């Protein structure tokens, strides 16, 4: 790139993976090994696993069809990515791959494992149509299923713990209906990559519209109240140069030959300006009130500033690691804060002046599990299999916990021995809040998910009214 950083791809010179990329060296000097496997290797591995497990091997062909509807297929798949060299941590490399992939006997992606070895994603495919995904799951979350029509288009998205959707396709419009019987219609124009949604009928009957130019760039948007906003893209770059609001007021935007914003003028006539160096780094920014902020750089191979100076002359300095991580920050008074990071880039310590430090620990999945200060006071954190924070244990041993529903929404929180609970509808909206003393607050929404009524624990009801564009116009 323009800073002299190079990403290098290493290809096998011979053998069954000849010509394939099996290694990458990034601009910071880290080397990653890409572990490839053939269909025959995966089939043999499946047979060996079955034998060691004392089960009957399942059908796993040694070869795949050379051509599919998606194109040529040589059967080679990426199975793992390893970090094999790190200039900053040469003696502390991960003992396991950063990510692993599992494949079906037909060569479809089946599972993804993170650096801790835990499964984080899984996929299921149609028995008849190779590569057609019919189910998908994040670990700890419900499985979402899909159904298709004869043309391979999704007609149903089935969500066992939330909203499900059906899709009906016509020549120039698509009708989407959710399990609450709310309907939206998307009207389209154009073909292939230039197809655009030009009109949307919302569930409440309101309509919004958009217009595009011949190459698919947005030119106008008309809201549900019939008010139109105009956009003027640059003929060559497509960058927006002017926005005119429904009341006729305009904002203008100007760019340099690198497509970087150099100035912007709002409807009120106020302007911001930006200047860049020959490498495209921001070196000066002028605010609408005329205040100037300057940015300094001491490394020609980095786009990160080493210092900033504001309109008052106050100066702040920063140092960075080769991986772009903040190592130290010195404020305008000379107060220095230093930061430590682990090999995964996560912050492990913050050191402030006067010997005050804070230390952070993470589990094998990269989740924060403990924060300890200089005096040894430690706060610990626990998570469920989906990665939701379930407990915070304070230094005195007190425990605050949270329970979640299948989709990761908090349904119960306990703090200081007091419990508060939440109930949701199928759309994921809070409909009932029960406080620590057992009193209730209920909520109602319109078909566009806008809050329209709130009844408090004292029985008093507050109603909210919105205009066609969704703006709150009255409460009573």
What positions do the PLM features span?
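Extended charged/polar low-complexity repeat regions
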Residues: 1-476
């Amino acid at each position: 790139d323009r800073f002299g950083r190079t990403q290098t791809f290493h290809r096998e010179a011979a053998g069954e993976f000849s010509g394939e990329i099996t290694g990458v060296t990034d601009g910071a000097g880290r080397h990653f090994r890409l572990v490839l496997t053939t269909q025959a290797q995966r089939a043999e591995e499946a047979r060996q696993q079955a034998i060691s497990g004392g089960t009957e091997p399942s059908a796993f062909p040694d070869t795949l069809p050379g051509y599919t509807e998606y194109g040529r297929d040589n059967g080679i798949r990426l199975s793992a990515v390893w970090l094999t060299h790190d200039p900053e941590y040469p003696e502390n490399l991960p003992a396991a791959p950063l990510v692993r992939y599992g494949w079906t006997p037909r060569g479809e992606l089946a599972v993804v494992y993170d650096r801790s070895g835990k499964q984080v994603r899984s996929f299921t495919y149609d028995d008849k149509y190779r590569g057609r995904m019919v189910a998908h799951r994040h670990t700890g979350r419900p499985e979402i299923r899909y159904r298709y029509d004869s043309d391979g288009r999704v007609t149903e998205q089935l969500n066992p713990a939330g909203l499900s959707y059906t899709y009906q396709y016509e020549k120039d419009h698509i009708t989407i209906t959710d399990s609450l019987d709310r309907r939206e219609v998307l009207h389209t124009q154009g073909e292939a990559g230039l197809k655009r949604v030009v009109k949307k009928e919302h569930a409440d009957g309101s309509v919004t519209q958009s217009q595009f130019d011949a190459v698919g760039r947005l030119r106008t948007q008309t809201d549900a109240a019939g008010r139109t906003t105009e956009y003027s893209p640059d003929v060559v770059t497509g960058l927006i140069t002017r926005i005119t609001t429904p009341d006729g007021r305009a904002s203008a935007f100007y760019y340099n030959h690198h497509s970087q914003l150099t100035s912007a003028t709002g409807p009120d006539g106020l302007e911001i300006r930006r200047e860049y160096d020959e490498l495209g780094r921001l070196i000066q920014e002028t605010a609408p009130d005329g205040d100037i902020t300057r940015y300094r750089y001491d490394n020609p191979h980095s786009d990160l500033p080493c210092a900033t100076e504001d309109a008052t002359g106050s100066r702040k300095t920063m140092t960075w690691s080769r991986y772009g991580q903040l190592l130290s920050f010195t404020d305008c008074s000379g107060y220095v804060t230093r930061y430590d990071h682990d090999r995964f880039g996560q912050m492990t310590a913050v050191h402030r002046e006067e010997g005050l430090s804070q230390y952070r620990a993470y589990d094998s999945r990269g989740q924060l599990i403990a924060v300890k200060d200089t005096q040894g006071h430690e706060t610990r954190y626990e998570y469920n299999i989906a990665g939701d924070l379930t407990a915070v244990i304070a230094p005195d041993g007190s425990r605050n916990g949270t329970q979640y529903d299948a989709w990761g929404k908090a349904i119960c929180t306990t703090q200081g021995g007091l419990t508060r609970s939440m109930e949701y509808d199928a759309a994921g909206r809070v409909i009932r809040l029960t406080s620590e003393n057992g009193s209730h607050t209920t909520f109602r929404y319109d078909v566009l998910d806008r809050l329209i009524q709130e009844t408090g624990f004292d029985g008093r009801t507050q109603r909210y009214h919105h205009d066609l564009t969704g703006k709150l116009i009255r409460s009573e």
